[in-house]
Amino acid sequence: MTSTESSQPADRYVVVGNPVAHSRSPFIHAAFARQTGEAVEYGRLEAPLDAFADTMRAFLAEGGYGFNVTVPFKLQAYDLADRLTPRAEAAGAVNTMWIEDGLIHGDNTDGIGLVRDIQDNLDTLLEDKRVLLLGAGGAAMGAMLPLIECRPSRIVVANRTASRASDMLEEFVEAADSFGVELWGGGLDALEQLSEDDVCDVVINASSSSLHGEVPPVPAFLLGDGVLAYDMMYGAEPTVFLQHAAQCGARTADGLGMLVEQAAEAFYIWRGVRPRTAPVLADLRAALQAERKG
């Protein structure tokens, strides 16, 4: 996990998923390596759906230094780890792994990537703010502890199934109490019961709605002027949620910055060097736009 001179053979890392050909991680980590001078080789690895653990143990046994994990293997990665960080334990999933002292370590950098994008790239400090989190699946779970650690005044979780939101919040009551954060959860239909006094400063879509071209049923007054509407999904065009939020008057941002920031955290874990993310994010955004035009 120390810096490696560029004259030495490159240390090998991969992103593992199924499918994985679409992953932007090699683009990002190649840019980090050029910027920092770290001797890193980063590729893609498609593991069989029924052989994730065996595939990754073999990768490490053959000299691999570490790897990122994308769908559908984040829960299996959690089980593969010999040691878990507190944020991986809280998320119940792992996206970053490495060997240290002969043990496989697992972390989850998704949530810290989200809050760094919001606070550093979008200049929106979360302390004392009110946050509305849409969804209660794996993406939301990974975001909860890093959000709580930013000390917002309140986090509201709204999910299609109300009981799922309540169950998720129960996992974070102790952490929320220690940071002085109020938690509330319910079904998406409960948002209709909120008043304009309940408007949140930041609305984060952590649901899968954008994948299906659906807009979560969020009342328009919750997406008005002064609100940051954030979608964890990204693309060359704004998601349907962000298009809707913009029409309601909100400032909008997609999850591309989160992708870059979570990668930067993984790079730091592996190499002990923290890369600058702004130029990489700009280059990746430009590449997406070029692909759309091409």
Swiss-Prot record:
Top-level division of the source organism's lineage: Bacteria
EC number(s) stated in the UniProt entry for this protein: 1.1.1.25
Reactions this protein catalyses: shikimate + NADP(+) = 3-dehydroshikimate + NADPH + H(+)
GO molecular function, one term: NADP binding
Keywords assigned by UniProt, alphabetized: Amino-acid biosynthesis, Aromatic amino acid biosynthesis, NADP, Oxidoreductase
Binding sites annotated in the UniProt record for shikimate: S23, R24, S25, T70, N95, D110, Y234
Sequence positions that bind NADP(+): G135, A136, G137, G138, A139, N159, R160, T161, A162, S163, R164, M232, G255
GO CC list: cytosol
Annotated SUPFAM superfamilies: Aminoacid dehydrogenase-like, N-terminal domain (SSF53223), NAD(P)-binding Rossmann-fold domains (SSF51735)
Annotated metabolic or biological route of this protein: Metabolic intermediate biosynthesis; chorismate biosynthesis; chorismate from D-erythrose 4-phosphate and phosphoenolpyruvate: step 4/7
Active-site residue list: K74
GO biological process: amino acid biosynthetic process; aromatic amino acid family biosynthetic process; chorismate biosynthetic process; shikimate metabolic process
Purpose of the protein: Involved in the biosynthesis of the chorismate, which leads to the biosynthesis of aromatic amino acids. Catalyzes the reversible NADPH linked reduction of 3-dehydroshikimate (DHSA) to yield shikimate (SA).
Oligomer status and interactors: Homodimer.
Family listed: Belongs to the shikimate dehydrogenase family.
Record protein name field: Shikimate dehydrogenase (NADP(+))
Taxonomic source organism: Cupriavidus pinatubonensis (strain JMP 134 / LMG 1197) (Cupriavidus necator (strain JMP 134))
